[in-house]
């Protein structure tokens, strides 16, 4: 039996998936940020997972230009001990 592939099926499938609800957008583009500052640890913490890894752009919706800046800023903040390297080190 063939799978149904109509618009009605797609809408129903999207409504059932809880991860599909929120549209991804770049927070930095919306705010008009030019440079991401490594000293703004509250913003940087939003882009670090619970295990200490940097969250990829495909999950956060951050544009590539800002993702590179974000990566550098997080690494600088870690080096200066503003952010922890792992989840076991609480800052």
UniProtKB/Swiss-Prot annotation:
The lineage of its organism: Bacteria, Pseudomonadati, Pseudomonadota, Betaproteobacteria, Burkholderiales. One of its GO terms (biological process) is translation. This is Small ribosomal subunit protein bS18. Keywords: Ribonucleoprotein, Ribosomal protein, RNA-binding, rRNA-binding. One of its GO terms (cellular component) is cytosolic small ribosomal subunit. Pfam families: Ribosomal_S18. InterPro entries: Ribosomal_bS18, Ribosomal_bS18_CS, Ribosomal_bS18_sf. Part of the 30S ribosomal subunit. Forms a tight heterodimer with protein bS6. The keyword Lipid metabolism does not apply. GO terms for molecular function: small ribosomal subunit rRNA binding; structural constituent of ribosome. SUPFAM superfamilies: Ribosomal protein S18 (SSF46911). PROSITE patterns: RIBOSOMAL_S18. The gene is rpsR. The keyword RNA-binding applies. Belongs to the bacterial ribosomal protein bS18 family. Binds as a heterodimer with protein bS6 to the central domain of the 16S rRNA, where it helps stabilize the platform of the 30S subunit.
């Amino acid at each position: 039996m063939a799978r149904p592939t109509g618009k009605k099926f797609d809408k129903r499938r999207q409504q059932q998936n809880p991860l599909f609800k929120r549209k991804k957008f770049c927070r930095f583009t919306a705010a008009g940020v030019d440079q991401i500052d490594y000293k703004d640890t509250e913003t940087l913490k939003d882009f670090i997972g619970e295990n200490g890894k940097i969250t990829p752009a495909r999950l956060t919706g951050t544009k590539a230009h800002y993702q590179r800046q974000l990566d550098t800023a997080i690494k600088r903040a870690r080096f200066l001990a503003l952010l922890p390297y792992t989840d076991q080190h609480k800052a």
